[in-house]
Regions:
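Basic, glycine/lysine-rich polyanion-binding surfaces/domains
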Residues: 2-183
């Protein structure tokens, strides 16, 4: 067989990548950097793959013990961009969500957010996360697992509700600011 040789200039950079699939039959996606990577890469070279994204494992200036105590006693910033985000829109959005979440969605006013579980009909938990009501017929679910997005899409198709479910994970990158001094 022929051997193909490519020559690259010294200035060429090559990014690490791992293939990720939402489901076994889903198209392969390569790991991505979050929107915060340019800044976090100045603070560490220790990144790990999490749900298709490279996120910091630890920062060079502090060790894991110091980071733990900062979270318990001070403040930390965590890149949570890999959390799964799903926009749920349409005239039946509220009634659809009312049928799939165990909380009373009708009590959630525009601009409010609450923590909830997402459960199967028999009560088994699929995922937990937050549901944000952006306006009357527009919501955003933020959960940790691809299974919740897939299950919500299945339920929307079964229900016949007039809702549009749009993945926003790649469009919205977020950090969590946590700890007792986070306010």
């Amino acid at each position: 067989t022929e051997i193909q040789v490519r020559v690259y200039p010294k200035s060429a950079t090559f990014k690490r990548a791992i293939g990720y699939r939402m489901t076994p039959d889903a198209p392969l996606q390569m790991t991505k950097e979050t929107g915060f990577h340019p800044r976090t890469s100045e603070l560490t070279r220790s990144f790990g793959e999490y749900r298709g994204y490279w996120v910091p494992h630890r920062f060079t200036a502090a060790g894991p013990v110091e980071e733990y105590w900062a979270c318990r006693e001070k403040v930390v910033v965590m890149d949570l961009s890999p959390l799964r985000k799903l926009e749920i829109m349409g005239p039946d959005a509220e009634s659809f969500l009312q049928s799939v979440f165990p909380r009373d969605i009708r009590k959630l006013a525009a601009g409010q957010i609450f923590y909830t579980a997402l459960c199967y009909e028999h009560g088994g938990m699929i995922d937990d996360g937050t549901l944000f009501r952006l306006c009357q017929n527009n919501f955003r679910w933020i959960g940790g697992d691809d299974a919740s997005l897939l299950w919500l899409r299945e339920q929307a198709a079964k229900s016949g509700a007039q809702v549009l479910l749009k993945s926003a994970t790649n469009d919205i990158h977020n950090v969590a600011v946590q700890g007792p001094k986070s306010r």
